[in-house]
Amino acid sequence: MAQYVYSMHRVGKIVPPNRHILKNISLSFFPGAKIGVLGLNGAGKSTLLRIMAGVDTDIEGEARPQPGLKVGYLPQEPQLDESKDVRGNIEEAVADVKHALTRLDEVYAEYAAPDADFDALAKEQGELEAIIQAKDGHNLENALERAADALRLPPWDADVSKLSGGERRRVALCRLLLEKPEMLLLDEPTNHLDAESVAWLERFLHDYEGTVVAITHDRYFLDNVAGWILELDRGEGIPWEGNYSSWLEQKENRLQQEERAETARMKSMKQELEWVRSNPKGRHAKSKARMARFEELSTSDYQKRNETNELFIPPGERLGDKVIEVSNLKKSYGDRVLIDDLSFKVPKGAIVGIVGPNGAGKSTLFRMLTGAEQPDSGNIDLGETVQIAAVEQFRDHMNENNTVWKEISDDSDIIRIGNFEINSRAYCSRFNFKGTDQQKFIKDLSGGERNRVHLAKLLKAGGNVLLLDEPTNDLDVETLRALENALLEFPGCAMVISHDRWFLDRVATHIMDYRDEGNINFFEGNYSDYETWLKNEFGQDVVEPHRLKYKRMSK
């Protein structure tokens, strides 16, 4: 086997207006290496993967795989064949095996022909059996079902043209994994996966024989899969050997030599350090490694790196003792029961993390809490002081030609939030849009930057109960940390739909978990506490992902 499977020599990329997003990157990739790509939003991570996949060839320098290397690429918006159903798209990955199985049956039949050429048939039989054996073709059907369950795919016969963006990504990811290319390039593979599917993907990629290069901000994923971290910092590619925790330790040695540190960053890191030190003994070993996070950003140049040190969640009116009380709630769509007899109370000061498969009804619960939808039966009782601010998952309802400042401020110099007023440019800066960044057009923003604009817009309402639908999607690790700290300092309550287990471990006081057939668990504790309880109560199999089972309406 070649020493390197992929090489980059002095690779650079210029984007409008004449900005070097990548510059002078020279890297070689080992066979079987597992590499996590980290960097701030807009640092060029997706651009790097497009270059490696051969999609973007307008570059400086040279990027090339070893001759004959099979490279598989998952972009953020993958293409599917809409003339085929879900199964048809998945089977594209194993077309050679299916053809070999069909042809092998024909070869067996041809042996019985009076004029059969036994030598030619035996040779072809050997070639076909080699193809089948290489991909475990005799267990093909089981492999398809296991992968479909693990990634919670839609039904096999589902119309691909009607799938949501998340469903399309899961189908594309499943197809790519079944292809088993020698090199996988994955752009945010954990997006639109629930926590159990992410855990399955971790195990799959950890054991994968090929090379994996993955952009992800899932910090447990980076800890459990990556053997290398490739950090993109101001256009440069910096490789670090080790997983996420190891990267933090190594980076500490570089950063601690610098003396300057911003007050906001130190405050942020101290808060996370306190959380790390308070971890249960069962996670002590990992916690010790993660204490290096305290030093990670303490001395780097803030203006150059443009990190999000703080996010600002405007406080609403003072929240009373009664927040949200739900009793005997039921909700169905068609003949599918999404929520069956749900009862829970959100106590004052709680942060409820909501987990479960896509399509289980998590966003539906939010719409019922805001009154946008009505339950089939049951009661939702909100406290008299409750003011809900809802931040939905879909962030495309923005004017692409607006600047950041105009989109957030509605062209007003003053923003009124609750009982106080704030200068609109100062408000934008609290979401880390400072100086000329406020004049960026929405159409030119990265996914994480769009997310921050969306948060800034929706949080102007100044509610004291936040409903956050996948707020962690597309955020870099620095912004994730800032959001965690903002939630921990928020004086009200929050209910947060998220699949980010680190995020849920750090901020959640309660977990709401959507299970099969409309059943929902409500647990006091963070995600790791809940997962431990679930395994102890029901065994390891209960946390293995599978296609969601819906309860049917009784007639």
Which role does the model predict for each range below?
Residues 272-281, 295, 309-316, 322-325:
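Alpha-helical coupling/stalk and coiled-coil linker elements that connect catalytic or binding modules
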Residues 1-263, 307, 313-555:
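ABC ATP-binding cassette signature C-motif
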